[in-house]
C-alpha cells in the first residue's frame, strides 16, 4: 500500500505509527526532507523538500505481493546555483506589474483619510463578522501587513492582506469560548514574535491577538457590556489557519464550517464597498 500524502510530516508519522498495513508514505506536502527516507515500525516515509531543490528516487523490491526492500534517496539538484534566464526575468516582472496594474484599477472605497494600524485592525474585525454573519471573531495582528486609506483598491488589499485564507465558523457556548480564549491568549504570548510559515499565511510574525465584538479580560468574557453566561451560544469566526494549524488544539476539536468562496481580503473588500468612510459609524 502506497500513500501519497499532503497532510504534512506530523500526520504522516502518525499514520505510520497507527497503520502498519501502509508500506510507503510519499510526502507531497513539500515542507520537509528525508535525504535517505525514514522508517517508522514497518512503514517507509519519503520526502524531497520543495522548489525542485531535490529529486526523490524510490526503489521498491516486491516479491509475491510483499514489499521486500525499499531504498529511498533525495538527490540535490543545486538549482539555486543556476542563473535565472533573462527572458524569464522580464516575463515574470511584466506579469507582476500587469497584475498589480489590474488590481490598482479596481477601486474599492474612499475612507476619507489614512487609517491608523488600530483602525485598520478594527475594519478587518468588523468586516469578517458582518460579511460572514457571525457574532464574534478572534484574529491576530500579524495578518494586517499595512494600513488602509484614504483610497482603497484591490491592490491595497492584496498588500495589506496577502494571505490565502478563508474563514471558519464555529458555534460555541460561553464556556467553550472561554476555553478557546484561555488557550489562544496563552499561546499567543509565545507566538507573538514567532515567524509563521505555511497554511496560507503570507505575513511575517503572528503578532497580538485581537477580538471583535467581545472582550476577554482577567479570565472573563464580556459581550454587549455584560459577562457572558457559560451556556449562551455564539457564532465565532476565525481564519482557517487556526483550525488547520497545531497551535490551538481546543479549536481543532470543534466542528467548524469552512466558508467559501471569499478570501479574507475579499470579505474586507465587500464590507468597505458597502460602508466606505462610514465604516466606524455603525
What are these regions, as identified by a protein language model?
Residues 23, 133-135, 234:
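Conserved acidic residues
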Residues 143-282:
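Feature captures C-terminal
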Residues 2, 25, 60, 128, ...:
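Divalent metal-coordination and catalytic microenvironments
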Residues 62-152, 158-160, 270-282:
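A short C-terminal boundary segment appended to hydrolase-like catalytic domains
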Residues 1-4, 24-27, 46, 136-139, ...:
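Structural recognition of the beta-strand scaffold that forms the well-ordered cores
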Residues 12-102, 188:
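Active-site-adjacent helix-turn-beta-strand microarchitecture at beta-sheet edges
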Residues 5-8, 28-31, 49-50, 141-143, ...:
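Active-site metal-binding loops of divalent metal-dependent hydrolases
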Residues 1-11, 108:
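Short acidic, glycine-rich surface-loop motifs adjacent to enzyme active sites
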Amino acid at each position: 500500500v502506497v500513500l501519497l500524502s499532503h497532510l504534512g510530516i506530523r500526520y504522516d508519522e502518525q499514520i505510520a505509527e497507527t497503520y502498519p498495513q501502509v508500506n510507503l508514505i510519499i510526502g507531497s506536502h513539500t515542507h520537509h526532507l528525508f535525504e535517505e527516507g525514514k522508517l517508522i515500525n514497518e512503514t517507509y516515509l519519503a520526502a524531497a523538500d520543495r522548489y525542485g531543490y531535490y529529486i526523490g528516487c524510490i526503489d521498491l523490491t516486491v516479491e509475491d505481493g510483499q514489499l521486500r526492500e525499499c531504498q529511498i534517496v533525495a538527490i540535490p539538484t543545486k538549482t539555486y546555483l543556476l542563473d535565472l534566464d533573462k527572458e524569464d526575468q522580464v516575463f515574470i516582472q511584466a506579469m507582476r506589474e500587469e497584475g498589480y496594474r489590474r488590481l490598482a484599477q479596481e477601486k474599492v472605497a474612499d475612507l476619507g483619510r489614512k487609517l491608523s494600524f488600530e483602525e485598520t485592525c478594527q475594519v478587518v474585525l468588523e468586516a469578517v463578522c458582518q460579511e460572514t454573519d457571525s457574532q464574534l471573531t478572534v484574529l491576530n495582528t500579524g495578518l494586517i501587513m499595512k494600513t488602509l486609506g484614504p483610497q482603497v483598491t484591490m491592490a491595497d488589499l492584496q498588500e495589506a492582506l496577502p494571505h490565502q485564507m478563508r474563514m471558519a465558523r464555529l458555534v460555541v457556548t460561553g464556556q467553550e469560548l472561554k476555553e478557546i480564549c484561555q488557550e489562544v491568549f496563552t499561546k499567543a504570548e509565545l507566538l507573538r514574535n514567532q515567524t509563521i510559515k505555511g497554511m496560507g499565511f503570507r505575513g511575517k510574525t503572528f503578532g497580538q491577538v485581537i477580538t471583535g465584538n467581545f472582550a476577554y479580560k482577567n479570565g472573563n468574557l464580556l459581550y454587549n457590556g455584560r459577562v457572558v453566561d457559560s451556556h449562551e451560544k455564539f457564532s465565532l469566526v476565525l481564519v482557517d489557519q487556526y483550525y488547520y494549524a497545531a497551535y490551538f488544539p481546543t479549536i481543532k476539536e470543534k466542528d467548524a464550517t469552512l466558508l467559501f468562496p471569499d478570501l479574507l481580503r475579499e470579505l474586507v473588500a465587500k464590507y468597505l464597498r458597502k460602508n466606505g468612510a462610514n465604516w466606524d459609524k455603525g
